[in-house]
A protein has these predicted regions:
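N-terminal active-site segment of His-dependent metallophosphoesterases
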Residues: 1-47, 57-66, 71-73, 138-141, ...
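Active-site neighborhood of phospho(di)ester-bond hydrolases with catalytic His/Asp-centered motifs
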Residues: 6-8, 28-33, 50-55, 78-80, ...
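Short active-site segment of divalent metal-dependent hydrolases/proteases
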Residues: 12, 36, 83, 111, ...
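Glutamate identity and glutamate-enriched acidic tracts
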Residues: 37, 67-70, 79, 117, ...
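Conserved beta-sheet core of the metallophosphoesterase superfamily
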Residues: 50, 87-155
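Helix-adjacent hinge/juxtasegments
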Residues: 50-92, 96-100
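Conserved histidine-centered catalytic loops in small-molecule metabolism enzymes
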Residues: 157-159
Length: 159
């Protein structure tokens, strides 16, 4: 069972508790707006770090705008989300872009969202840093147990 830490919108700072969770997971996923690439060096998951460009990361040319992660029980699509609606990315637009995914991860809004109303699920971990974190730095963990159970757990840390 792989365990993932999902974060976004760090804007140069990741809350220490989010770093701690990421480093205890097998895979860490950062859904963009990193701002300072050295921020990623704090993240040392057991197996793999995946990070994508956000709308403020054009200067980090080593990162892709979209990434995919595949498991026997489904695929995860990762993008920042800003191209699907600037103020509030459209979940229907994201679902149309990645119809074969089980989960779509996006960032951009700084707001934590778990939308399981239809497949693929659309999730946003919220802001992991201090800027516009709407009541605390946030992240998700996701445990992939088998074909039927993918468990998402939200975290909020008040500084």
């Amino acid at each position: 069972m792989p365990k993932l830490c999902i974060l976004s919108n760090s804007h140069g700072f990741i809350h220490p508790e989010v770093v701690k969770i990421a480093n205890q997971c097998d895979i860490a996923i950062h859904a963009g707006d990193i701002i300072n690439e050295s921020t990623l060096s704090q993240l040392k998951p057991k197996q793999k770090l995946i990070a994508i460009q956000g709308n403020n990361d054009d200067h980090i040319s080593s990162l892709n705008k979209i990434e995919f992660l595949e498991f026997p029980s489904g695929k995860i699509a990762i993008e920042h989300g800003h191209l699907h609606g600037h103020q509030k990315p459209s979940h229907e637009s994201l679902r149309s872009a990645y119809p074969d995914a089980k989960v779509i991860i996006y960032g951009h809004t700084h707001k934590q969202v778990i939308d399981k109303e239809s497949t693929p699920w659309v999730i946003n971990p919220g802001a992991s840093g201090e800027i516009r974190n709407h009541g605390g730095s946030k992240c998700f963990t996701m445990g992939i147990y088998d074909d039927k159970e993918w468990l998402i757990t939200p975290y909020v840390f008040i500084s």
